[in-house]
Amino acid sequence: MAAGLVRMNTPGYAELHCLSNFSFQRGASSADELFRRAREQGYQALAITDECTLAGIVRAWQAAKVHQLRLIVGSEVQLCDGPKLVLLVENLTGYQNLCALITRARRRAEKGAYQLFRDDLLLHHQGLLALWVAADSGDTATGAWLRSVFAERLWLAVHLHRGSDDAVRLQRLRALAADVGIRAVACGDVHMHVRGRRALQDCMTAIRQHCQVSEAGRFLFANGERHLRSQAQLAELYPLDLLAETLVIARRCQFDLSELNYQYPRELVPEGHTPASWLRELCEQGMPLRWPDGPSGKVRDVLAKELGLIEELGYESYFLTVHDIVAFARSQRILCQGRGSAANSVVCFVLGITELDPMKHHLLFERFLSRERNEPPDIDVDFEHDRREEVIQYVFRRYGRHRAALTAVVNTYHAAGAVRDVARALGLPADQVDALAKCCGRWSDRIPDDQRLAEAGFEAGSPSLRRVLVLAGELIGFPRHLSQHPGGFVISQQPLDQLVPVENAAMPERTVIQWDKDDLDMVGLLKVDVLALGMLSALRRCFDQLQHHRGRHLTLATIPSEDPATYAMISRAETMGVFQIESRAQMAMLPRLRPQKFYDLVIEVAIVRPGPIQGDMVHPYLRRRLKQEPVTYPSPQLKEVFERTLGVPLFQEQVMELAMVAADYTPGEADQLRRSMAAWKRHGGLEPHRERLVQGMLRNGYTLAFAERIFEQIKGFGSYGFPESHAASFALLCYASSWLKCHEPAIFTCALVNSWPMGFYSPDQLLQEARRQGIEVRPVDVCHSDWDCTLEPDAEGTLAIRMGLRLVRGLAEADAKRVQQARSQRPWRNVEDLCLRAGLDARARARLADGGALRALASDRHQARWQVAAVQPQLPLFADVQALPEEPVQLPVPTVGEDLMADYQTLGTTLGPHPLALLRARLRALGCRSSSELQGVEHGDNIAVAGLVVGRQRPQTASGVTFVTLEDEHGMVNVVVWRALAERQRRALVGSQLLKVSGRLEQENGVRHLIARRLEDVSPLLQGLDVRSRDFH
């Protein structure tokens, strides 16, 4: 039969069984690829039926709208006690039942698995159409049971893939359908949009089965027929009535995700109030706390405007929900602060959600909420990182697990992971797999080029290597698995599984929905971000210690503002441990920018970011700040927008204001411009604004050159344009931590170490910095140390830091707590008394002895190890028998070097001499200067230094430059390694613990760094000292 005749007689087709890449290592094509191809093939509809998941259905919905093809929502499931089915959603009831089925199946199984039974179908089958995927010899009893459940909503799926037995298979399946009394329908069991994805699909199958493709055997498909075939090809395989039946089913499936009716929680509103009246009441209660002398008329006007828009858009319950969570945290003395665009809102400020007065800082409300956008605002709240779980569990208790769950995060393949998985699947040796994966950047989405491959010892033209790289390139960006969002909550009035499936999280006592934040935005579901921030934990500890040791009660709101000493410290870049300005890039900027007031900190936080740097905004701003070029404005109207930043746009809000003032954008249009800035590289979303923006500016009298330059600067924001509200929220924590470091450095350092892990620096670096500042740091001692580091005042009130037992590597907190509890009853008599009364096992005793924590009871580590080894469990029969005194054993005292080595191995730090102090003579012989000697070196001089590598950073803004931080006995040396040198001497750069650097010293505006010319690994000089860098590996 001619192909043209086949096409004429084809009744049309809808694919009812198709897996996307959200089937996680089964489907080899994205929803966008599938819908584009289905549209090209003239399909009437396409069902996405990923196995027991709806994780990709929102993206499929978006793809369907883009390609103007109808989506049928569905899922493939395998019953534990029954057949394989494809369930298709007919209406809203069917969608709710499918969500409930998937939820049941996922919640009763381990993460990544599911268990679904016949009884589940009996409870949740209404509104669902079922396609029975039966073997050729499927039993009629199963069919009869299915028909009893689904009645006329049951079909037999017929999959034909050009197998040698297609004709027999078709005949048997038709007979089975007739025996059961149901209709048959054509299905493709589609796993890819085109045949060309067959190799990737085979590879993904091997990855899923944890084997090589050559070993996958029966798990692989026999051919590449599971793609979206043309209707002519389908007509060659299927009888026309089976093809026509696909359209009958498609016409019945009328559900659309736009039908979801999300409802906010309602129980937060007391009797006698509406959500709107209760929100207004809470705002009235909050105003005296924010403005003790009463709010100004302008504040009341803005508050009324915000409340009016919130009520108009129906978001009152959203604000009440966030307020309730924050109120709980404050009731438990958990420090928290809203950040991001919420800081633009006066309502959030008076509710206590944010700590920054948006009126005082001229923040733009439209960045937070606008009528045109008509979607829920996004409120992010940071909580102390070590107490956030209390807040998460409160939300679960408050709303129940059936109404509250965490959002998902879609973990996708980056280049390294894709290369690693594909290379394994294709059978490359393990050492080659590792070497090839290391050729990719950690988070890069680019396959390594030929030069990088050659440097790693690969033959770039090798066919086997090319195959790995091609398939890995196809896999990049595919979903790998779902994980839980750190704290993004979805909370609803109705059970969540009426909206989206819910499954168990990897962590106990948590549940997670199958959608991520982008999915939620698309369907309009409420999300509250309960995030963790280590600095809040440290600040709360600081405030507690200030109250205890100084009798001074401070909060974020009452820390003395605009303190000259604090800004002087910041301008000297003495900011180790300070929030947001402790990185080497920030420290290099501080002496140039020299912050003198709070808004300078807002700029400092925002300026060392990809957006301002790539938009060429940093250097013009600095030149104007240093009065090296005049401050000019294109018009008086734009002066109001840019005056705070000296005529240079630095913030997203300024771009929005510019568009409104200079190009006549409405606030909602300006917000769409902001959103497009973030997406333009991925979706080209900014180009439609070029003409609108440029023409609007030309109409208002601006030059074409100025308009084009502004547009290019806006594109720079696409990488990471920082919101002013976000920078201001962070600047508040930056200032608070700076003030504490300046005025209470012992308290600040103690709090940082107790809150670790957080920030850039290890406890060793923080404690050594404290010692350089003249703060006494006292050793770990079972006679004085608690689990946390503590503060011990002397007679004059000067505080010393007592190192806590938390620093002893391998010691459990429970053991430390038992030491504290037993010691509170009476002092230790000796090592044996400690071990027995504290109930320490052999492991805990050894950790304390090795960590030097027993010096007060045993003179040194050698004696301590000997004495803990001699402790015998006390048996009840001999409890009152006095042991015979033993002769003390004289052991050699450890050398300084041995103690130093043991300190680093067991504590990660030392209170003895710095390792480089012991090596200084040998380093001088190698021509190395110390950090303290650099003050006398002239700009441009060639010198050599050596130090412990305590940090390596390669910011994405730095064009491949690596910043290395070296530490010696006097301080830090900042080293700049250009890309060419880094690639040439990668082994020394990446692998050194003790690094010698030769290069040229540069000094400008108080910033000093060494431009590396040669790197040399001199780690053998350490003779095994345990010093670990914190870097980008």
Curated annotation (Swiss-Prot):
Signal peptide: none annotated. One of its GO terms (cellular component) is cytoplasm. One of its GO terms (biological process) is DNA repair. InterPro entries: DNA_pol3_alpha_NTPase_dom, DNA_pol3_finger, DnaE2, DnaE2/DnaE/PolC, DNAPol_HHH, NA-bd_OB_tRNA, PHP_dom, Pol/His_phosphatase_N. Pfam families: DNA_pol3_alpha, DNA_pol3_finger, HHH_6, PHP, tRNA_anti-codon. SMART domains: POLIIIAc (SM00481). It catalyses: DNA(n) + a 2'-deoxyribonucleoside 5'-triphosphate = DNA(n+1) + diphosphate. It is found in: Cytoplasm. Keywords: Cytoplasm, DNA damage, DNA repair, DNA replication, DNA-directed DNA polymerase, Nucleotidyltransferase, Transferase. It comes from the Bacteria. GO terms for molecular function: 3'-5' exonuclease activity; DNA-directed DNA polymerase activity; nucleic acid binding. Its main location: cytoplasm. HAMAP family: DNApol_error_prone. DNA polymerase involved in damage-induced mutagenesis and translesion synthesis (TLS). It is not the major replicative DNA polymerase. This is Error-prone DNA polymerase. It comes from Pseudomonas putida (strain ATCC 47054 / DSM 6125 / CFBP 8728 / NCIMB 11950 / KT2440). The lineage of its organism: Bacteria, Pseudomonadati, Pseudomonadota, Gammaproteobacteria, Pseudomonadales.
